[in-house]
From Swiss-Prot:
Residues 93-121 are annotated as: Disordered. It comes from Campylobacter lari (strain RM2100 / D67 / ATCC BAA-1060). This is Small ribosomal subunit protein uS13. The keyword tRNA-binding applies. HAMAP family: Ribosomal_uS13. Keywords: Ribonucleoprotein, Ribosomal protein, RNA-binding, rRNA-binding, tRNA-binding. GO terms for biological process: translation. It comes from the Bacteria. Belongs to the universal ribosomal protein uS13 family. Gene3D superfamilies: 1.10.8.50, 30s ribosomal protein s13, domain 2. InterPro entries: Rbsml_uS13_C (IPR027437), Ribosomal_uS13 (IPR001892), Ribosomal_uS13-like_H2TH (IPR010979), Ribosomal_uS13_bac-type (IPR019980), Ribosomal_uS13_CS (IPR018269). The gene is rpsM. One of its GO terms (molecular function) is structural constituent of ribosome. Located at the top of the head of the 30S subunit, it contacts several helices of the 16S rRNA. In the 70S ribosome it contacts the 23S rRNA (bridge B1a) and protein L5 of the 50S subunit (bridge B1b), connecting the 2 subunits; these bridges are implicated in subunit movement. Contacts the tRNAs in the A and P-sites. Pfam families: Ribosomal_S13 (PF00416).
Length: 121
């Protein structure tokens, strides 16, 4: 099992899909990395030589922000929005949808479980 950027890649998958298990690398980025390192998309993760794995590690480390660093950067960006007091920051702070979705119905993912407001008497 190849370990790249602190993530164990699944052995049986093709390397182009295996790299997408790393946070911050999608299929497009995966293919760009493989093109730069000269590795075939069809190769399986368990077929990688140590030199090829090292080349992929080097390419990712030098040119891409992945895993913990990327998560930290995203969290800092959201915190900066909240500190600025921007509209998007306020929506993040209140736990509401940020990108203009309606909230009268739906938005349950952001709002959480329904909370009943007292009945009229």
């Amino acid at each position: 099992m190849a370990r790249i950027a602190g993530v164990d890649l699944p052995k049986k998958k093709r390397i182009e899909y295996g790299l997408t298990y790393i946070y911050g690398i999608g299929l497009h980025t995966s293919r760009k990395i493989l093109d730069k390192t000269g590795i075939s998309y069809d190769k399986r993760v368990h077929e990688l030589s140590e030199d090829e794995a090292a080349a992929i590690r080097k390419e990712i480390q030098e040119n891409y922000m992945v895993e913990g660093d990327l998560r930290k950067q995203v969290a800092m960006d959201i915190k900066a929005l909240m500190d600025l007091g921007s509209f998007r920051g306020l929506r993040h702070r209140k736990g509401l949808p940020v990108r203009g979705q309606k909230t009268k119905t739906n938005a349950r993912t952001r709002k959480g479980k329904r909370k009943t407001v007292g009945a009229k008497s």
